[in-house]
Amino acid sequence: MPRALKILVIGMFINVTGASFLWPLNTIYIHNHLGKSLTVAGLVLMLNSGASVAGNLCGGFLFDKIGGFKSIMLGIAITLASLMGLVFFHDWPAYIVLLTIVGFGSGVVFPASYAMAGSVWPEGGRKAFNAIYVAQNAGVAVGSALGGVVASFSFSYVFLANAVLYLIFFFIVYFGFRNIQTGDASQTSVLDYDAVNSKAKFAALIILSGGYVLGWLAYSQWSTTIASYTQSIGISLSLYSVLWTVNGILIVLGQPLVSFVVKKWAESLKAQMVIGFIIFIVSFSMLLTAKQFPMFLAAMVILTIGEMLVWPAVPTIANQLAPKGKEGFYQGFVNSAATGGRMIGPLFGGVLVDHYGIRALVLSLLVLLLISIATTLLYDKRIKSAKETNKQASISS
């Protein structure tokens, strides 16, 4: 692993640790401390996610235009300014405005970071993106745990800790990346006929992202509707929190298992994703009969294995599909797809559960995951057809 990627991994860990001080506590803060309804809290979080989608697209575009260092620094500057504002102004309505700006700024950072990972270690393939993925999840585990402890003293300390960690992230990127060039990354697309195949590649990206949205829509239920369901059947909040602790530990420590599965059964990224989505289906199927904590724990363990196969594969494929000079845009597109799934998932799940119950939601999610498998199998069909056409044209000439 190149030194530049190691620095980026450390930076992303610090970044996500800081963000995770706040995001799990947003609803509690808005509802319990600001006195707003859960509906209002949901709308605020939707604004934050919507701004992140815009930031994802903007961050990818900026990476292609001004490079990784400037793009990430701009995103950090926007986010850091907003977080410093939250330290002093965290009442209503300043909170909603600043949290939305935080969503946009952090949204700029993520696709630029993924695109930079692919640029500084193009020969690393999935390993580069998997390293970023593991760092993010380690940050979520550490930040979520520490955030609850800090919030028990004062929410003001949560905002301060978030800002301080983001300031550290700023210095890591500034001193670690200002002399790194990312413009000469080797082309790793499926085809090198950009003029002929750019439309086919973008169509492949859209189809792939469609399945990615549905995957995240299903996954997001674990932190929303499924969380509420566990409370309704008598599983304590502390036990529910254990599920996410196990998730984080497995992601960090379970990489040898993922490597074994990939080498044994999933040499291609497409096969890796299909196996991952099938594992998702197994996990969600268990929820149809789950009534006790051990069943939810088993379902979470299985879900985590699936996500370790699917989530890092998508940015890797996007990097392979991207024509020269479009790496950032393609990363921004798949990042916005993930954010979009997380944004609409709670609303989708909430409506279904309110009107038809948890069983109807789970059955609907199983259908959506089957669609995700279909999109994964079909996303590159047009590219293969274009490649065949190019071969025939070259033979004829």
Swiss-Prot record:
<feature type="transmembrane region" description="Helical">
    <location>
        <begin position="157"/>
        <end position="177"/>
    </location>
</feature>
<dbReference type="InterPro" id="IPR036259">
    <property type="entry name" value="MFS_trans_sf"/>
</dbReference>
<comment type="similarity">
    <text>Belongs to the major facilitator superfamily.</text>
</comment>
<protein>
    <recommendedName>
        <fullName>Uncharacterized MFS-type transporter YttB</fullName>
    </recommendedName>
</protein>
<keyword id="KW-0812">Transmembrane</keyword>
<feature type="transmembrane region" description="Helical">
    <location>
        <begin position="233"/>
        <end position="253"/>
    </location>
</feature>
<dbReference type="InterPro" id="IPR050171">
    <property type="entry name" value="MFS_Transporters"/>
</dbReference>
<feature type="transmembrane region" description="Helical">
    <location>
        <begin position="202"/>
        <end position="222"/>
    </location>
</feature>
<keyword id="KW-1003">Cell membrane</keyword>
<feature type="transmembrane region" description="Helical">
    <location>
        <begin position="360"/>
        <end position="380"/>
    </location>
</feature>
<dbReference type="Pfam" id="PF07690">
    <property type="entry name" value="MFS_1"/>
</dbReference>
<feature type="transmembrane region" description="Helical">
    <location>
        <begin position="269"/>
        <end position="289"/>
    </location>
</feature>
<keyword id="KW-0813">Transport</keyword>
<feature type="transmembrane region" description="Helical">
    <location>
        <begin position="131"/>
        <end position="151"/>
    </location>
</feature>
<feature type="transmembrane region" description="Helical">
    <location>
        <begin position="5"/>
        <end position="25"/>
    </location>
</feature>
<feature type="transmembrane region" description="Helical">
    <location>
        <begin position="92"/>
        <end position="112"/>
    </location>
</feature>
<keyword id="KW-0472">Membrane</keyword>
<dbReference type="GO" id="GO:0022857">
    <property type="term" value="F:transmembrane transporter activity"/>
</dbReference>
<keyword id="KW-1133">Transmembrane helix</keyword>
<feature type="transmembrane region" description="Helical">
    <location>
        <begin position="293"/>
        <end position="313"/>
    </location>
</feature>
<feature type="transmembrane region" description="Helical">
    <location>
        <begin position="69"/>
        <end position="89"/>
    </location>
</feature>
<dbReference type="InterPro" id="IPR020846">
    <property type="entry name" value="MFS_dom"/>
</dbReference>
<feature type="transmembrane region" description="Helical">
    <location>
        <begin position="43"/>
        <end position="63"/>
    </location>
</feature>
<feature type="transmembrane region" description="Helical">
    <location>
        <begin position="333"/>
        <end position="353"/>
    </location>
</feature>
<dbReference type="InterPro" id="IPR011701">
    <property type="entry name" value="MFS"/>
</dbReference>
<dbReference type="GO" id="GO:0005886">
    <property type="term" value="C:plasma membrane"/>
</dbReference>
